[in-house]
Amino acid sequence: MNITWIIAILILMLFAHIVDDYYLQGWLASAKQKKWWEKNAPDKLYKFDYIMALFCHALSWSTMIFLPILVYSLINNVSLNLFYLAIPINLIIHAIVDDLKANKFKINLIVDQSIHFIQIIITWVIFLFIYCN
């Protein structure tokens, strides 16, 4: 794999992060907050619905950041084993981090985004290690 592909994949992963975390979240940005449910649907039936919103956003984000690697893998007919691990691991981390920011108020936006960037870099480095050896 040449350096152009390597850098392009990282840039596309970062771009996918920006698109998904800022432009595609829409209603989920509100729905992943407990306080939104308490205000708009105070019935006990909806008490934990914010968890599903966190899950949906984290799944979308995890899939989006992996799309450049997925496309590369399909074009070059290489194993998708990383896909089966990266999506659930990134999903869990992303959901926990967003919950810490949106509901627990333990971290701010800078820490939230820094952790997401680290997730992307680690996923990219693992991709390089697997596919460039």
What are these regions (language model features)?
Residues M13-D21, W61, A86-D98:
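Alpha-helical transmembrane segments of multi-pass membrane proteins
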Residues I65-I89:
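Transmembrane helix-loop-helix
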Residues I96-I118:
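Interfacial loop-to-transmembrane junctions
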Residues W124-N133:
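Juxtamembrane boundary at the C-terminal end of a transmembrane helix
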Residues H17-Y50, V97-K101:
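Cytosolic, membrane-interface loops and tails of multi-pass inner-membrane proteins
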